[in-house]
Amino acid sequence: SVVLLICLLLLGQVDGSPVPEKSSVKKRLRRMTPFWRGVSLRPIGASCRDDSECITRLCKKRRCSLSVAQE
């Protein structure tokens, strides 16, 4: 009977423990080192988000471009 009482108390503690909110937990993005940034540069025609991702350093219309005037 004492064991049952202890188990019930422990279950009550687990059930009542606070759960961290997902909105307060932010996932930190890892930054690439200069070595990996250079190794992972994208070729002409590959999709991109900004100039730093392309081997030519030109991202136009979400594609790695060869020149600024290229459409």
From Swiss-Prot:
One of its GO terms (cellular component) is extracellular region. InterPro entries: LEAP-2 (IPR009955). One of its GO terms (biological process) is antimicrobial humoral immune response mediated by antimicrobial peptide. Residues 17-31 form a propeptide. The keyword Iron does not apply. Disulfide bonds join 48-59, 54-64. Has an antimicrobial activity. This is Liver-expressed antimicrobial peptide 2. The lineage of its organism: Eukaryota, Metazoa, Chordata, Craniata, Vertebrata.
